[in-house]
């Protein structure tokens, strides 16, 4: 099965745009209850990276000034870990190693445009069903 067949579509996934402020990111992440969220390039919807609430917290602490930190662009935040993405044409069977180390896998097309996510649960459920056949 291709990754795109199992993916949660982009319209059902909350995301940030690279021109958001830290305050914007906190508001959006608290509203959707995400601990990590995809960041896209505005206008092109290209996937850039994923930002965690821990990354944001470390940024605020390192700034030492909450008001100033909330106005910073999210692009100024250092990320603790890289979240690997995959091409929408990849076979789900090939994603086990990525899925066990990430809560989700961002899905992109050949141009890097965000096409949704594969959750760890959806990949593991699919692979588990295949092993029972």
Task: Outline where the language-model segments fall.
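Alpha-helix boundary recognition
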Residues: 7-8, 30, 61, 78-79, ...
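Short beta->alpha transition motifs characteristic of CBS
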Residues: 34, 38, 46-64, 101, ...
């Amino acid at each position: 099965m291709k990754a795109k067949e199992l993916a949660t579509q982009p319209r059902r996934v909350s995301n940030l745009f690279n021109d958001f402020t830290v305050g914007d990111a906190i508001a959006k992440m608290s509203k959707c209850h995400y601990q990590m969220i995809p960041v896209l390039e505005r206008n092109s919807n290209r996937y850039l990276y994923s930002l965690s609430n821990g990354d944001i917290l470390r940024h605020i602490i390192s700034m030492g000034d909450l008001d100033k930190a909330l106005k910073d662009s999210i692009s100024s935040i250092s990320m603790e870990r890289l979240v690997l993405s995959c091409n929408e044409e990849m076979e789900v069977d090939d994603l086990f190693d990525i899925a066990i180390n990430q809560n989700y896998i961002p899905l992109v097309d050949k141009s890097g445009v965000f096409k949704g996510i594969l959750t760890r649960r959806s990949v593991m459920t699919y692979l588990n069903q295949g092993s029972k056949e």
